[in-house]
Amino acid sequence: MPYCTSLRQHNPKIYDLFESIPVSSHEHELFARYIKNNTEIEGHLFTPKAEIEGFEDIDGLIRKYNSRLYYKHIGRRIEEYKNYLYIKSYVEDSTEIIKKLQELASSGVSQYTASVDSWISRESYTIDDDGKKEALRQMFADSHVALIYGSAGTGKSTLIKHISNFWADKDKIFLANTHPAVDNMRRKVTAGNSEYNTIAKFLSKRNNNTDCDVLFIDECSTVSNDDMRRVLEKANFKLLVLVGDVYQIESIYFGNWFSIAQKFVPETSIFELTHPYRTTNDNLLTVWDRVRKLDDAILEPLVKNSYVARLDESIFEHGEDDEIILCLNYDGLYGINNINRFLQNSNPNESVVWGINTYKVGDPILFNESNIFSPLIHNNSKGKIVSIRPEKQQIRFDIELEESINGIDAWGYDFELIGESETGKSIISFSVNKYRSTDEDDEDNDSTVIPFQVAYAVSIHKAQGLEYDSVKIVITNETEERITHNIFYTAITRAKNKLKIYWSPETEQSVLGRLEVKNSTKDAHLLSRLSSITMTS
C-alpha cells in the first residue's frame, strides 16, 4: 500500500507517488493517509467521521484498508468509536502511558517533605526562588511521579538540578530525545550516580542499564507516545520526573501524552513554573505571553516595539556579536544556506577553503553531533572562530567558547586550552586531518570531520534549547503554512534582548490568522470513555 506505508528511512513525497503510481484502486490508502496525517501532523487522536470530506463509502474504505494490513501491523488498524475514527496503536499507547502515570500518582513517599526540609537546613542548600523550593518540598509527598510544566526560560533545568542534588546518593537516569537536551542536563546536574542517554540509545537492544531510583525525562513534548510507552516498559525505577513545555516544538512522530497527562493525574503530581529568567525585557515578556495564550492583541506589542519588519535585504546585516537568524527552509534567497553564505561574504576576514566548506576568522559556529569534545563541549554549543591555520595535511582552528572552562575540565580531551578572550571566555585549539588514517576504525571519532558548522543562520528546530541576545526570524510566503503555534513560540523565545521578525504584510496576516493552540480536551474525554480511565480535570 504505497500511498500510506513506506520502507524504513524511505518516505517519498506524495507528488512523486502520484507521478509514479496510478491513483485508481488506491483510494483506501489515501484515506488511511488522511487519518494518519490528521493524527501525526494535526495532533488529533480522534477524527470526527462527519467532518471527513472528499471520500465516499468511508466504511468500505476502512474495511478494505484493514483487510490488507500485514498481520504484524495490526496496530495500524483504523477503528471507530462513537462516530470518531482512530488508529488502534495510538490509542493503545496513550492508554498504557496514562494508566502507568495514574498508578505512580496513587501514593507518595513516606515522610518526604520532612526529609527535604531537613536536607535544606542541614546542607544550608539555596534554591533560587520560592516556587521551585515549594515544588521540591511537595513533589513526592503524595505521588511517585512529578509532571513539571514550564515555558521557555522558567528554570526547568534548574529544578532538575535541585531534585538531583536532593537524591544525590541515589541512582539516576536522565533521558531526552535530542543530544543537546541530554548534554544540557549533563552540564546542569553535578550530582553523582547519574547516567545520561538519548531515548533512542536507552531503548536500543544493546542497552541493559535500565535500573534506577529516579528516572528523569526532559523535553517531554518531543517524545512520541510509542517511545514513551517503551521507556516505561523497559525502565525499572521508583520515582519518575517528567519535564517539558507543551507550547514548544512537538514530537516528530505522534506524541500527545504529555499534553493530556495533566487531565488524568491529580494536582499533587503537577507543578508549573511561570517566572521567566531568560530575559528581564518587559516588552519581550509581553510578546511571549500573548503568543503563548494566543491573545487577540498579539500584533500590538510586535508593532509598538518594532519587532516586525518588511522582508528585504536588511536581513543580511549582521549587527550583534550574539545574534542568530532563524529560518524554516534551507534553500532560496532567504534560506539558511544563502544567508550563511551572504553574511560570511560580508565578513572582511580572509577566506579559508577546506574541502567543500569555507571558514573565516570571526564566523559564529555551533558545535554539531560529530563533536568529539562532548560532554564538556556539548552539541549545539556556541562559539566563534578566532584563528585558522591551514597546512598540507591538516587544518588548525582556535575557537572562542561561549563560556569559561579550566585545565581540569579540559583534561583528557583532544584539544588545547590556550587562553581566554577579552571577555573572559575560554579559547581552545584543535586540528582536523585532511585524510583519515588507516588505523581509524571508529566512525564516531573520524579525525577528518570538522566538529562544528558556521552558524549565522540555523533552523528554528535546531535552535530549540539555544538563546541569543539578538534573534532575527525569517518567514517567507513559501514557509508560512509550516509556521505552527509551537514553532512560532519556540522561535521568539530564543531572544534575550532583541527580536525582529521579517515577513511581508500578507505573510504576517496569514501566520497570525492561522495560529492555534492544539486543544487536547476532546481527545482526552474520548480516550477516557473508550479506555475506561478516569479524568481528574
Which residues does each predicted region cover?
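Core RecA-like ATPase module of SF1/SF2 helicases and allied nucleic-acid translocases
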Residues: 154, 193-196, 279-282, 320-537
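Pre-Walker A adenine-sensing motif
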Residues: 124-142
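Conserved adenine-nucleotide phosphate-binding loops and their immediately adjacent elements
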Residues: 110-124
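ASCE P-loop NTPase helicase motor core
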Residues: 138, 146-304
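Conserved, well-folded catalytic cores of nucleic-acid-processing
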Residues: 100-107, 166, 188-191, 234, ...
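Conserved RecA-like ASCE P-loop NTPase motor core of nucleic-acid helicases/translocases
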Residues: 148-187, 243, 299-341, 351-358, ...
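Flexible, charged surface loops at secondary-structure boundaries
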Residues: 139-141, 167-169, 208-211, 235, ...
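N-terminal accessory nucleic-acid engagement/regulatory domains that precede
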Residues: 1-111
